[in-house]
Structure formats: structure tokens, C-alpha cells
Amino acid sequence: MKKILFSFLATVVLVSCGDKGDDNVDYQTNRLVKKVTSKNKNGNLEEVITFTFQGGRPISQHSSYYKDGVQTGTTQVTTIHYEGNLVKTENAGRKNFEENNYFYENGKLSRSTEKRERNDYTTTYEYSYTNNQVTTVLKSYPTTIYLKSGGTQSGTRYTERQFTHNGNTVIEVKTGYEKDLNGVVVTNTVSSNGTQTITYTLSGGNVVKKVEETEYSTTTREYTYDTKHNPRYEMIGIFNPDPTKTLEAYNGKNNVIKEKYNYTEKSGSRKIVFIYTNEHTYNADGYPTIVKLYTEENGTREFRGTTEYEY
């Protein structure tokens, strides 16, 4: 459903978890996106997303996908249910077979579950906080554990994200592991359970740098922003209220106009550098109406497509 739910937003941000969950939230409909149209470099439609609003907030989303300008499949409908002004449930897919549920404590997201058409299980996310900042997100789902000996056993797969906040820096450590049905960690598996460390540098409500370190590689992303309104930021708290979404650069206060990507393997065998550039056209209120995407690699700049916003 993350693909279905406003995919161009990559879901939504909570800048200060809990603040946007107040029942007195006043949604300013004129600032929220009503329609998003994506086209490829040839001008052919790729995706059209429209929203239905009630009481100043979206209650449904219609998503249509295209190949060479021709729609593929039927329009997908997502329905959003609220408890007060907090998102409680999102249903989508055939016979609402895809579903997200959200649970809160003191206005903060404490747990969420997701069910997908392609999976026969439910994935659970659990959230912990210190001083109103998210410190741990634990993802879990049932799985078959494949042992190095060649055997298998039933168990649970976990991905744990731990966050340390220090001024304008956030450090995330991500680890994966598996437990048997008795809750004991299984070590002799064929799964890759390495540790990934991600360092975020923040400035003015935006992520300006992101460095990902693994055992084998380093990936650095550096972001440059405009000073205008980001429509993604304006959708705060309406869809997926996951507080970690504030660490996604394209969910920041302003719009990304340049992203420099640098991937280096620690063995020295490979290095990749390229640049994304976004050129914006704005309305009178300072919101983007058209965004043109370009990529640049080895000195060659290429137009990739456009995204159009209607408010």
C-alpha cells in the first residue's frame, strides 16, 4: 500500500511526532494536493493520482497507472478512515485486501500493521520514544528460516532501527535477525543479517546530507533545496503517520532542487556518481505546479519526465 498511498510522496512526514495528531488540526484544503500527474520523458502518462476530500481532509485516493500513455489495469482506490483527526485504517486493493491499521498512545503512533495482497501474513511495526523523539522502530513478520545445514524451521523475521538524536544529526543503526518460535535468536541461517549505519544531517527542516555505511560500501547523498513550499510537507499527518518519514529528504519543508549521489565500494572496485536535478514552476502562493526531472552522469544531462500538481 505504500506504493498505492500517494506514491509520489513516499508517504508522509510527522515533523514532531504527536503535534500533528491533535484533534484540533485545521486542514487547509486549498494547500493540499488534489491531483498529481506524472509523465515520462516523451510526455506520455505514467501515473495519475486524485483525491476526494470531506471536511477539509482526504477520504479516498484514486490511482491509475499507464504504459506508453495507455492505462494498465483498473484504477486502484484507497479509502482512509479516521479516529478523530488521527488516521486509523487505510483500505485498498481488491475487496480491501490490502490494509494498514494504526494504533496510538498519547497521540503518538505506537504500533501499526500492514497486510498485502501478495503476502499471506501481517507485518507489524512497533515504535518507542524518548523526549518526544522516535528512538526505535521494530518490524516483524512470520517467516521460514533457512539454515546453513540445509534444513528449515518456522520463526519470525525482525528488522530493528535504532535512532540517536544529537542536535542537527540523527544516527540510525539498522540490524536484522531471526527468532524461532520460542523467541530465541537463530544464528546459523543463510540470511544476510549485517548492520547498516545511516547518518542524517538536518538544517532548517530539511535533510541536507545522508550517509549510509555497510560492511561493503558507502553511499552519500547531498541535497540542495529551494525556499518554496513543499506539497509533501503540507500533507503532514494525513496518511501514514510513521515519524521516521521526517528523515526522507523529499518530505522536507522545502523542495529538493538537486541531489548528488555517490556510491563507493570499500574494495575500491566500483564507484558511481550522478546528479538529480529538479526544475520547478510555482504558483502565486509559492507551491510547485510543474517539476521537471533531469539526471546527469559523466557530464551528460538527460531529461527524465515531469510531475504536475493541482491544488
Give short role names for the model-derived ranges.
Residues 11-12:
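Repetitive helical segments and hydrophobic/amphipathic motifs
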Residues 15-16:
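C-terminal motif of bacterial Sec signal peptides marking the signal peptidase cleavage site
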Residues 19-311:
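Buried hydrophobic residues that stabilize the cores of well-folded domains
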Residues 2-7:
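Sec-dependent signal peptide recognition
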